[in-house]
A protein has these predicted regions:
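Membrane-embedded alpha-helical bundles of polytopic integral membrane proteins
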Residues: 2-215
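Generic detector of well-ordered alpha-helical packing
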Residues: 6, 43, 155, 226-229, ...
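Divalent-cation-assisted or electrostatically stabilized phosphate/pyrophosphate-binding catalytic cores
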Residues: 176-183, 242-258
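Alpha-helical membrane segments and immediately flanking helix-loop junctions
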Residues: 216-224, 231, 247-254
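Interfacial helix-loop-helix junctions of multi-pass membrane proteins
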Residues: 227-243
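Final/C-terminal transmembrane alpha-helix of multipass membrane proteins
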Residues: 253-269
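Juxtamembrane boundary at the C-terminal end of a transmembrane helix
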Residues: 266-279
């Protein structure tokens, strides 16, 4: 199992790095759109769409929505994402209560649109936008930063959870997660943000805002993970798919990012660090 995970990671890493950091904006949009479309194919299964043709059709609908949003103001979609993730907090908190309201195939399919589409919009808003924070103007580093926030939060949560994780966060959704893990992840994210602020020669005020933005993003990333866990538990499946041998599916790898990316993109836009760009 470990060997399979390593081989898959070694194959995917250069593809991901090349697609994210070396493609022009339109190529980046197509590359990330392909990932989101594959994620939509997986989400169809989590929605209860079983027929292969129907799953493909759902993925194509999501791809069509992405195309239709190419010239729609990104900020409007990002605001929608923020309100959606606030609602998700209530859904996860009440589970299994309330599942009769969102448990239909149609409702879960719509949930997929609300998760996947804003993530793509947020990524491409960052990729095409103008960026300035401290002495940094490289928007590709923003994408790397939000990825790192999620990874740092996961690492901090893992070690804090193992050491102090007695009080469970959402035992009916994800029994392995603990409140200690959440706090440990947030502490790690705060330290990481302070270090990045120093490296970017940011002012004290900018660094403080970065810490706040990163903490909010870290919290929301937990919701992304919990939402997918809730849907898989409701559906009775362990992984979103087996597209990535040893790792499960694409959604199993990007669930936290689907929440973190649009929220972080919105926050830094409101702060004036990120401005709308052109294709």
């Amino acid at each position: 199992m470990l060997k399979t995970r390593i081989i898959t990671a070694l194959i995917l890493a250069p593809i991901a790095i090349g697609g994210i950091f070396f493609l022009p904006p339109l190529g980046f949009a197509l590359f990330t759109g392909g990932i989101i479309t594959l994620g939509a194919w997986e989400w169809a299964n989590m929605s209860g769409i079983v027929a292969p043709a129907a799953r493909v059709a759902y993925a194509l609908v999501v791809a069509a929505v992405l195309y239709g949003l190419l010239n729609v103001p990104a900020v409007a979609v990002l605001w929608l994402a923020l309100f959606w993730w606030i609602l998700c907090f209530l859904l996860v908190r009440s589970y299994p209560g309330g599942s009769e309201r969102w448990g239909s195939v149609a409702a879960r399919a719509i949930m997929g649109l609300l998760v996947l589409v804003p993530a793509w919009v947020g990524l491409n808003h960052i990729r095409t936008g103008g960026f300035e924070f401290g002495d940094s103007t490289n928007n590709l580093l923003v994408i790397l930063y939000v990825f790192c926030v999620v990874w740092v939060a996961d690492i901090g949560a893992y070690f804090a959870g193992r050491a102090f994780g007695k009080a469970k966060l959402a035992p009916r959704v994800s029994p392995g997660k603990s409140w200690a893990g959440v706090w440990g992840g947030l502490v790690a994210v705060a330290v990481f943000a302070i270090i990045i602020g120093m490296l970017a020669s940011a002012t004290v005020g900018q660094s403080l805002l970065l810490v706040i933005a990163s903490l909010v993003t870290g919290l929301v990333s937990v919701l992304g993970d919990l939402l997918e866990s809730m849907l898989k538990r409701f559906r009775g499946i362990k992984d979103s798919s087996q597209l990535l041998p040893g790792h499960g599916g694409i959604m199993d790898r990007i669930d936290s990012l689907t929440a973190a990316i649009p929220v972080f993109a919105l926050i830094i836009t409101l702060m004036g660090w990120l401005t709308t760009g052109q294709w």
